[in-house]
Structures are given as C-alpha cells and as structure tokens.
C-alpha cells in the first residue's frame, strides 16, 4: 500500500505546471527527495555537490548491466519531476532544487520553511501521548462514519464534502454510504489513507482558487516538523492558515482553540513523507497490524480484536453472532455478502481484507483462506451480477392476442422491448419508449 501512495503523490507532482516554485522551499525539496525511489535518491546525492554536468555514459559505470532497467526508471522519474535536466548527452541537476536541498541538509538560511517553533512555554501541557490520542480519535471518527458504526460522531463539513467528492461515499448528505472505492480506502495503511484525502484536497484547492503550490509547501512542511513541539501560526501565509483549520478536522494538527497562536503537528502529519503506517506510537504494539482473523471452512469467522473500527468493518460483510472483550464471532452468509455487494463492495476486496488481516496461525495454511469460502464468495458475486435491473414500464391487460402481438411488434421496431409474455399478454419496455408506445396505443383505441 505504501508504494501505491508514493505513486499517487508522485503522479500529482509530475503534473504540476510550475516546478520552479515548488522547489523554492527547502522543506519541499527534502520531502520530494524522500518520495523518490532509492536509486533516484542515490543519483541526486551523487550530483548534489558537483555543479558540473555529468555524461550519461558515466552513470552506466555505476550499475550492473542487469540493473539497466532500474536506471532508466530512475532517470525518467527525475526528468519528469524536473530535478534532472537532460540535453541528450549530459545530465544537470536543477539549480534551484540543488540550492534549496543543500539548505535543507545543512540548516542554512532564514526561510521558515521548517516552521517557526514557539519560544514561550505553553501553559496547557501538550504531550506526545496526548497528541497520539487526539490524532487517533479524530482520524477514527472519519473511519467509523464511513463504515456506519452506530452512534458514530459526524466529521466536519469539509471532511464530508471531501469523502463524497473523492467517491469514497455516495448518496444524500444525511444518508451517505460507503462505496467500493471507500472500502478499498479502508484496506490501505494509514499513510496511504491520509494521502488519498489530501490529494482530493489538493484537487479541491484548485477549484477554490487556493494556490496548489502553497498547499503542497505546507503539507511538506508538516512532514518535516518535530512531534510534540509547538509552532507559531503568525508566520503562516493566509492560505496556510485556512489549511490549518481544515487539517484539524483530519487530526493532522492540534490547536487548543481556533484563535490559538500555536499549533502542534500530530504523528499523522510528521509521518507524511515517511513509511509511517500506524496510529500508534509503536507499530509493534498494534495487534491488529499483525493479523487477527481466523476463518473456518464452515464460513465461521473469529476476530481477535477489541477495535470498534475493525469490528464495524467486519460487520459490513459478515453477520456478527457474539462479542467478548477481545473476540468477535461471526459467520459469512449469502445474505451478508449480498448486503456488502449492494453497498458496492467487491468480492475481491472482501477476500483481500481477510487475507491481509489473517491471524498468524493461518499463515501456515496453503492456500491461506479455505478455497470453499473463497469460491463461494465469488459465486455469490456472480449470482448478483447475473441479475440486471432495467427501469421501464409494464403493459398488460390486453383484450385480444392480435392487439397484444401488434403492440409487441411496434415495441420491437422502436428497439425498446425488454421482455414479453404472450401467455400473460404482458410486455415490458424501457422508459425511453414509454411516450411513443402510449401514443401508439391511443391511436389504436381511437380506431
């Protein structure tokens, strides 16, 4: 999942029309560097303190012939990101990127690119544990709302708008339901989830006339801040102060009050450009990350978790029968799978979820999940897809066979006939043929 998130943000960065402005901030250059493939990073570092162009042939000496494909991928990425400039023979490092990246590494300049820490002590003690708890509660409020947890809190208006705009939920405002894309979102690690929403936020910023480069600068700045340290609001631009209010709703930053002149980045923010994947301070402490689901051949499911979020997700495709302090027992049935399918969740997504969260005890099984269960879930999906709903109008109660046959022939000529039964003197047409058919029957009645 981490590779997917890196691919998405890199794709967005490649499409930016003006990279010169993006690379004017040291924090942005550092963040972009962290998002590059490993070999691309190596090439950047090898040229960083060398102002002279390097011949393409010289790079060939650094790698084995069998690794040529990786070199090509790295070069293409660096050129598309406008970090490398290639004239067909020599490669030069972007001068602005070089300058600002060196500043980021050496700590020089007076640019406030990495935020301005508050010098006075906060009267209200804010600890790392508090920030972790705040971020976890705020982010899981969004996830609980998506899966429809009973009595779940409503996220802010900005979050609701983004969930719908990004296709993660659909329906009227007071009846939003998770979509197939939304369930896929739940399968991602925490960092990929956050970047999914932030990329939608970046696209939305263009519609609201916010500068996407300034938005990126602020996100990259957050990724370079220190967890547990307070930073001043006064040095932020107008765009960044608007963003600060929005990002509070995602749990990326904490402010005691809206008018507070200081803010604290949470672990969700400081991990934006790293491989951070958990809401917990130590990833190893999260049992859910290790796998907690056991599935039997009789379709019974045992989930060793106390997480309300994971229990709610399982409830999307299984009937829960019993719940204990750290164990939930359920069963996967035709009705529970059909319910999930009706919500837009695919069979493959359910199987992926069960595989991803399989208990270590199941890891020795080959295949990991019972084949009978996997096959049955796919069969239930095929059963649903075999039935197709077509909106239209049913015509019936014809007095004679000839009148019925002539009406059916007319519907066929129009190309709107869906179904007919001469035995019952009934036929069904699409809505597009309703008006012509009604007019035809009226003409017949006049005769």
Swiss-Prot record:
It comes from the Eukaryota. The keyword Magnesium does not apply. The keyword Nucleus applies. One of its GO terms (cellular component) is transcription factor TFIIH holo complex. InterPro entries: Tfb2_C, TFIIH_p52/Tfb2. One of its GO terms (biological process) is nucleotide-excision repair. GO terms for molecular function: ATPase activator activity; double-stranded DNA binding; RNA polymerase II general transcription initiation factor activity. Keywords: DNA damage, DNA repair, Nucleus, Transcription, Transcription regulation. Component of the 7-subunit TFIIH core complex composed of XPB/ptr8, XPD/rad15, ssl1, tfb1, tfb2, tfb4 and tfb5, which is active in NER. The core complex associates with the 3-subunit CTD-kinase module TFIIK composed of mcs2/cyclin H, mcs6/cdk7 and pmh1/tfb3 to form the 10-subunit holoenzyme (holo-TFIIH) active in transcription. It is found in: Nucleus. Component of the general transcription and DNA repair factor IIH (TFIIH) core complex, which is involved in general and transcription-coupled nucleotide excision repair (NER) of damaged DNA and, when complexed to TFIIK, in RNA transcription by RNA polymerase II. In NER, TFIIH acts by opening DNA around the lesion to allow the excision of the damaged oligonucleotide and its replacement by a new DNA fragment. In transcription, TFIIH has an essential role in transcription initiation. Belongs to the TFB2 family. This is General transcription and DNA repair factor IIH subunit tfb2.
């Amino acid at each position: 999942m981490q590779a997917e998130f890196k691919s998405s943000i890199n794709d967005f960065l490649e499409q930016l029309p003006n990279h010169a402005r993006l690379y004017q901030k040291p924090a942005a250059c550092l963040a972009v560097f962290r998002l590059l493939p490993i070999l691309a990073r190596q090439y950047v570092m090898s040229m960083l303190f060398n102002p002279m162009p390097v011949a393409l042939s010289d790079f060939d000496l650094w790698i084995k012939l069998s690794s040529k494909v990786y070199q090509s991928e790295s070069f293409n990425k660096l050129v598309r990101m406008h970090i490398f400039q290639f004239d067909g023979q020599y490669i030069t490092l972007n001068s602005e990127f070089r300058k600002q990246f060196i500043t980021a590494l050496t700590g020089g300049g007076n640019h406030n690119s990495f935020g301005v820490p508050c010098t006075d002590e906060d009267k209200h003690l804010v600890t790392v544990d508090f920030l972790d708890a705040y971020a976890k509660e705020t982010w899981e409020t969004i996830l609980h709302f998506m899966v429809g947890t009973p009595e779940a809190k409503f996220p802010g208006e900005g979050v609701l708008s983004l969930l719908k705009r990004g296709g993660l939920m659909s329906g009227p405002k007071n009846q939003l339901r998770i979509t197939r894309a939304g369930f896929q979102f739940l399968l991602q690690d925490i960092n990929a989830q956050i970047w999914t929403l932030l990329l939608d936020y970046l696209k939305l910023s263009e519609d609201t006339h916010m500068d996407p480069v300034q938005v990126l600068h602020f996100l990259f700045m957050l990724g370079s801040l220190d967890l547990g340290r307070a930073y001043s609001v006064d040095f932020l631009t107008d765009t960044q102060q608007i963003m600060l209010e929005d990002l509070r709703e995602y749990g990326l930053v904490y402010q005691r009050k809206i008018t507070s002149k200081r803010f604290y980045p949470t672990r969700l923010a400081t991990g934006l450009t790293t491989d951070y994947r958990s809401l917990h301070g130590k990833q190893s402490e999260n049992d859910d990350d290790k796998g907690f689901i056991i599935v039997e051949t009789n379709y019974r499911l045992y989930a060793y978790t106390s997480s309300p979020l994971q229990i709610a997700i399982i409830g999307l495709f299984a009937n829960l029968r019993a719940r204990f302090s750290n164990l939930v027992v359920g069963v996967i049935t035709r009705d529970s799978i059909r319910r999930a399918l009706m919500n837009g969740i695919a069979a493959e997504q359910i199987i992926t979820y069960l595989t991803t969260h399989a208990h270590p005890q199941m890891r020795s099984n080959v295949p990991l999940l019972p084949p009978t269960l996997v096959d049955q879930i796919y069969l239930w999906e095929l059963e649903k897809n075999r039935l197709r709903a077509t909106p239209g109008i049913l015509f019936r109660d014809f007095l004679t066979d000839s009148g019925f046959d002539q009406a059916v022939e007319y519907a066929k000529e129009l190309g709107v006939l869906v179904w007919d039964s001469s035995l019952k003197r009934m036929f069904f047409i699409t809505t597009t043929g309703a008006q012509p058919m009604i007019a035809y029957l009226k003409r017949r009645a006049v005769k």
